[in-house]
Design a protein with these regions (language model features):
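Acidic catalytic motifs of isoprenoid enzymes
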Residues: 1-3
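Hydrophobic, membrane-interfacing alpha helices
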Residues: 5-7, 41-43, 47
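Accessory "access/gating" subregions that flank catalytic or transport cores
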Residues: 11, 15-21, 30-35, 49-147
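Short, conserved phosphate-binding/catalytic loop or strand-edge motifs used
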Residues: 24-32, 45-46, 177-180
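Catalytic phosphate/nucleotide-handling subdomain of diverse soluble enzymes
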Residues: 37, 48, 125-205
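A glycine-rich phosphate-binding loop feature that marks nucleotide/adenosyl-phosphate handling sites
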Residues: 47, 68-71, 85-86, 160, ...
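Long, charge-rich low-complexity segments
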Residues: 61-64, 93-101, 168-172, 201-217
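Catalytic cores of secreted or luminal carbohydrate-active enzymes
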Residues: 186-251
Length: 251
């Protein structure tokens, strides 16, 4: 349990609320992951949170990866698999499938206990980041096509690239079907169905609070706890509104 993938798959928000502060993001991620994980399970949380936080400052994948690696111990299996994938990419940058063969051979599920160990999937995340070449869609697609824990790996690298490229870098083929929906997994069910703009504003306010900075007034006014408030101010926002009878609801 301690080193299964759960340590890095539910901590993206700690990177989002610590923009430009990789070390602080990693510390928050470690605290969250340590509730149920340890060792490499926690190191994965540190890497992902730091990478997301760094992506607010740069879209350069090497800089983002370096920020994540700086938050790992010098000697640990998590660092080893990430560096192995990076070295392979440097020598063979043409085809991610060749790198996947490396992961199957040296870092596969057969090497680790449990049903979904973090190490093989960490390798997939690094592979997708490098071979995706800074493109949101290609990065997510590689993480998915690689197999293993497809949704978790695509989610982690998708968060990193989503921050790095901004909404302009996310193709309509992803934006339109999702339609600003976000589904959480909290204990209180009524809090689990959200829309992305509302989530973004709440995360932004929390980020200002963590940083000890005053949030802009327009952001404060746009977030109204306990209310349903849609202003469509964020670019491309739909607030997950769906029409049941589009024939009668033409624009």
């Amino acid at each position: 349990m301690a080193e299964q993938i759960g340590g890095q798959i539910f901590i993206d928000t700690w990177g989002l609320v610590n923009p430009g502060a990789p070390q602080r993001a990693a510390d928050y991620g470690q605290t969250a992951a340590s509730v149920s994980h340890d060792g490499n399970g926690v190191y994965g949380a540190r890497f992902m949170c730091a990478a997301i936080a760094k992506a607010f400052e740069t879209s350069d994948i090497d800089e983002i990866v370096d920020a994540g690696l700086r938050e790992l111990p010098e000697v640990c299996t998590y660092r080893s698999v990430m560096e192995a994938v990076r070295a392979f990419h440097k020598a063979h940058p043409e085809n991610w499938r060749d790198c996947m063969e490396l992961l199957f051979r040296d870092w596969g599920y057969d090497k680790y206990p449990g049903v979904c160990h973090i190490i093989p999937n960490a390798g997939v995340c690094m592979m997708a980041l490098l071979y995706g070449e800074g493109k949101f869609d290609r990065t997510v697609e590689i993480a998915t096509m690689a197999g293993w824990d497809t949704d978790c790996n695509a989610g982690n690298v998708g968060t990193i690239l989503g921050v790095a490229t901004g909404i302009a870098g996310i193709p309509r083929k992803y934006l339109d079907p999702i339609n600003d929906a976000i589904v959480c997994s909290g204990i209180s069910g009524y809090l689990n169905i959200l829309d992305i703009p509302s989530f973004c504003r709440e995360a932004a306010l929390l980020g200002y609070r963590i940083a000890g900075e005053e949030a802009p007034q327009d952001l404060k006014k746009a977030y109204r706890p306990g209310e349903v408030y849609f202003d469509f101010e964020l670019p491309g926002s739909t607030h997950n509104i769906r029409l049941s009878d589009p024939f009668r609801c033409r624009a």
